[in-house]
């Protein structure tokens, strides 16, 4: 089965006897991809001590830094799921717990190379990436939208819920049926558009409630809580997808943690 370092830095030792100490060194590097791939950062040759430290710095900023969030989200998942099981009328606790669980699945993709299940080659890279980075992200959006509605103690309109559920099934099918990363990238663009439709419904709910005196306080609290997530998501969209920056970590993950804590 194939594997990749994902968001971690690649560090290779080159035998000194194979290097030209007094001139240029030209290397041929083959990148094996499933549909699409590239070298994501600048390549340099240096002493092993510096290269090793630099690789560790890049790996920490783009991969290992996310590990610290998993424990908190898993605790939140267990706590709020337990509350829901004792009080099943409060649907918001179930939505919030599932939102945390799906977020954990998404974050796992950032440090997959440190997971025994992945490094032992039990799961092919494409399948792991489909489930963790893509499907878990789609599920997180679905449950977040549900939470924005159930937070006010209201039951979601059955027709709207069925429409969102159908959209979710379509998104999961598109991701699961992608045969390589090129097709997966195309499918994910379509899924993001469908996610926006689902999320708009959830976001509009607190905005509508802010005009109702009895719900205004909860609406303001919810809007304040999600403000860091919205700002960090917009920053990542500009920084990652427009400017193409590869060094800074995904700030939306940090913004999402602030939202969960609030």
Language-model segments: residues:
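An acidic-aromatic loop/edge-strand motif
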Residues: 4-71
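First transmembrane helix
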Residues: 55-87, 188-212
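Hydrophobic H-region at the start of alpha-helical membrane spans
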Residues: 70-74, 97, 166, 223
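Juxtamembrane interface at the cytosolic side of transmembrane helices
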Residues: 76-105
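Interfacial "cap-and-anchor" motif at the non-cytosolic start of specific transmembrane alpha-helices
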Residues: 104-262
